[in-house]
């Protein structure tokens, strides 16, 4: 995948959050260096997803794979390190925003266009998504029919890692003071998320 400014910025952001958490947990300094080196190697192999709305999630997937290849810890422990590092970052909280901004009706037109574009499947590893209309049960609904993180994990020979990144959505929703309800994930064998 191309190392665009966006990809490099997101990579640096995740790395700084995880690096700080590794330090808090007493890891050796070379662990963070090994993670970023491995992450760069994975991103160089990763299939292009263009200017996807979910490029930060794709980069997160690569970074998590790199952690699992570099720390000597279990996927669960690496998930906790990643989660705690992000939650401790004030910048992350600021960037995520809140429920009001995320659910703004002004964003619906862009979401619908994104959904339509995703169905063209221009990039093999990008997500394919349907936006669900507001109803009595929820303010915003998504059906992800294809998942870029699952595809990246499959390409890297570690499909079992995708499920840990699915859990990160609950962390993000909590940070934004939203409630996330999920009926299944592709990573766990469901037809869609």
PLM features: what roles do these ranges have?
Residues 130-188:
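Short, hydrophobic/π-rich interface segment
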Residues 1-69:
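N-terminal, charged low-complexity regulatory/assembly segments
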Residues 59-65, 69-155:
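Amphipathic interaction/junction segments at domain boundaries or subunit interfaces
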Residues 123, 188-189:
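A short catalytic or substrate-binding loop motif that flags glycine-/basic-rich loops and adjacent residues
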Residues 192:
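A short beta-strand signature within small-molecule sensing/ligand-binding domains used
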Residues 28, 74-77, 159, 179:
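Short coil/loop linkers at secondary-structure junctions
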């Amino acid at each position: 995948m191309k190392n665009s400014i966006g990809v490099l910025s997101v990579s640096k952001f995740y790395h700084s959050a995880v690096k700080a958490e590794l330090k808090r947990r007493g890891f050796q300094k070379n662990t963070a260096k090994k993670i970023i080196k491995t992450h760069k190697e994975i991103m160089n192999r990763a299939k292009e997803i263009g200017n996807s709305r979910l490029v930060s999630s794709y980069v997160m997937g690569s970074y998590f794979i790199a952690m699992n290849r570099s720390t000597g810890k279990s996927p669960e422990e690496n998930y906790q390190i990643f989660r705690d590092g992000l939650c401790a970052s004030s910048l992350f909280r600021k960037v995520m925003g809140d429920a009001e901004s995320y659910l703004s009706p002004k964003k619906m037109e862009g979401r619908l266009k994104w959904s339509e574009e995703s169905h063209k499947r221009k990039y093999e590893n990008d997500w394919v998504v349907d936006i669900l209309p507001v109803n009595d049960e929820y303010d915003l609904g998504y059906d992800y029919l294809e998942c870029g993180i699952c595809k990246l994990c499959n390409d890297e020979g570690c499909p079992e890692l995708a499920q840990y990144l699915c859990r990160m959505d609950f962390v993000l929703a909590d940070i934004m003071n939203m409630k996330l309800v999920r009926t299944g994930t592709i990573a766990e064998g469901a037809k869609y998320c």
